[in-house]
């Protein structure tokens, strides 16, 4: 229902997602006001956090509510949040080895992450896979909670080549699945058109993604038997496929410039930096840059980014990285996160952010810091935020000690090489839990044989030799690994 307010009592809002909690003492009313749907949701959660003392991470910290006979709200209350500085603010639940089975134990387990995302005033979630037929459960949950859907960096129009057989068997009902090859371009288009049509018909608020990679987190030439052999020829294929996908999106979205993102991850970062891959560019195309793979700092492509390029800027940072990074214990921390995001924002105003959040629970601390930064860069400082967090979750009495413990924890990680980031960077490379696990495994497998370099790279397509561990013996006063 619409509530008619006297004009003299009305407070204007700012823009998308802006919100206000205020008291009209003359009318004896409390207003929770939002510019739009998510703004209204954020206003409700602002009221809950401020006056009911429900912290955003109430579920994850085993919070126990305090009984209140009376809730006092000052008549001067006027809590205003302008529009967030970063338009799209997302989590990526990647490598869910612990989280996936836990969500099946109860409906609350399955849905609490969406509530938490909104309580922290984020608005986007990377879970865009289709179900063949129809949209997947992740997209349905985002629609239920009013959350924007976006896709992992290997997704093309909400699908990957891992779904190739599923599409042909479940949707097209064919007995013989067509060969997955570059020569079969019409079949590739059919897969992508189905994805575009399905998403549009679902009504989900979706940021489109274009990419051309393998069936998993690998270059396309690992998967396609007829892939070219040179970097230049491979880049031509990628350029062609990205344009085809863009045209399909425009056809089904019925927009000239819908929001589309592409992510420069691993081989894409190198090909873009070399000028071989040139993605489509327009005012609503979001070029999403990444950290330096296996270590989390702005990579060479964003360092060389020309801010005059007519695109919007996105950034993807891993707080979690399964194969060689932090997976069971948080390692990057708010200070390193802040450095990354301030550097990227100095290139051009950031429009989209994604943090890889793994199984969630281990990373809620830094994810909360990231959410606060993305709303208002000017108001954020990691040291101040760290203490505020300690006060909120542990109380004023122990806040200083708890805040010191958090910072000491993150700065205790071994930095196995000196930084080479232009201008310097604290903790550019650190030895996270999965690096230790793999190093110990390699050493154990060959324990009785000496090698000056016992730690090999993981994959045949590892693009930077030695980056899996990045141990520089000389930086540690040693001659060998």
PLM feature segments, named:
Residues 216-222, 309-334:
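Active-site clefts of carbohydrate-active enzymes
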Residues 36, 121, 285, 344, ...:
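Conserved, mostly hydrophobic/aromatic
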Residues 158-193, 310-318:
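Active-site-adjacent "subsite" loops/lids of carbohydrate-active enzymes
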Residues 1-82:
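Contiguous, structured surface segment used for ligand recognition
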Residues 107-137, 141, 145-150, 346-352:
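Catalytic domains of carbohydrate-active enzymes, especially glycoside hydrolases
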Residues 386-481:
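C-terminal non-catalytic alpha-helical accessory regions
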Residues 66-73, 136-144, 177-309, 411-433, ...:
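Gly/Pro-rich turn-and-neighbor structural signature
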Residues 55-128, 213, 311-314:
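An acidic-aromatic substrate-binding cleft motif
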């Amino acid at each position: 229902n619409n509530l008619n307010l006297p004009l003299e009592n009305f407070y204007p809002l700012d823009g998308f997602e802006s919100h206000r909690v205020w008291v009209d003492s003359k009318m004896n009313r409390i207003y929770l006001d939002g510019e739009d749907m998510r703004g209204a949701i954020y206003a409700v959660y602002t009221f809950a956090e401020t006056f009911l003392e429900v912290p955003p991470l109430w579920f994850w910290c085993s919070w126990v509510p305090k009984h209140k006979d009376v809730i006092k709200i000052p008549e001067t209350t006027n809590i205003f949040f302008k529009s967030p500085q970063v338009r799209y603010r997302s989590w990526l639940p990647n490598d869910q080895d612990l989280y996936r089975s836990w969500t099946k134990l109860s409906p609350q387990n399955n849905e609490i992450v969406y509530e938490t995302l909104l309580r922290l005033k984020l608005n986007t979630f990377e879970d865009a896979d289709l179900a063949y037929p129809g949209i997947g459960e992740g997209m349905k949950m985002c629609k239920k909670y009013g959350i924007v859907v976006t896709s992992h960096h290997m997704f093309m129009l909400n699908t990957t080549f891992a779904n190739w057989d599923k599409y042909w068997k479940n949707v097209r009902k064919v007995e013989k699945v067509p060969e997955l090859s570059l020569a079969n371009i019409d079949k590739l288009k059919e897969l992508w058109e189905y994805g575009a049509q399905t998403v549009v018909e679902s009504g989900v608020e979706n940021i489109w993604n274009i990419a051309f990679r393998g069936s998993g987190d690998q270059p396309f030439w690992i998967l396609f038997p007829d892939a070219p052999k040179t970097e230049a020829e491979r880049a031509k294929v990628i350029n062609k496929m990205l344009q085809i996908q863009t045209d399909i999106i425009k056809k089904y979205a019925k927009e000239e410039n819908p929001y589309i993102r592409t992510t420069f991850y691993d081989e894409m970062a190198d090909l873009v930096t070399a000028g071989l891959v040139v993605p489509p560019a327009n005012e609503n195309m979001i070029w999403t840059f990444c950290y330096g793979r296996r270590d989390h700092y702005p990579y060479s492509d964003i360092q060389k980014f020309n801010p005059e390029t007519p695109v919007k800027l996105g950034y993807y940072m891993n707080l979690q990285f399964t194969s060689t990074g932090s997976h069971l214990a948080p390692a990057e921390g708010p200070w390193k996160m802040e450095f990354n995001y301030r550097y990227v924002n100095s290139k051009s105003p950031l429009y989209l952010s994604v943090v890889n959040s793994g199984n969630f629970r281990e990373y809620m601390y830094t994810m909360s810091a990231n959410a606060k930064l993305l709303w208002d860069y000017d108001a954020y400082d990691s040291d101040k935020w760290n203490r505020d967090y300690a006060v909120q979750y542990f109380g004023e009495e122990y806040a200083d000690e708890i805040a010191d413990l958090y910072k000491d924890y993150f700065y205790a990680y071994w930095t196995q090489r000196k930084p080479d980031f232009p201008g310097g960077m604290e903790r550019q490379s650190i030895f996270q839990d999965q690096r230790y696990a793999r190093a110990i495994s390699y050493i154990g497998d060959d324990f009785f044989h000496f090698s000056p370099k016992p730690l090999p790279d993981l994959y045949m397509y590892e693009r930077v030799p030695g980056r899996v561990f990045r141990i520089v013996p000389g930086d540690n006063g040693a001659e060998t690994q």
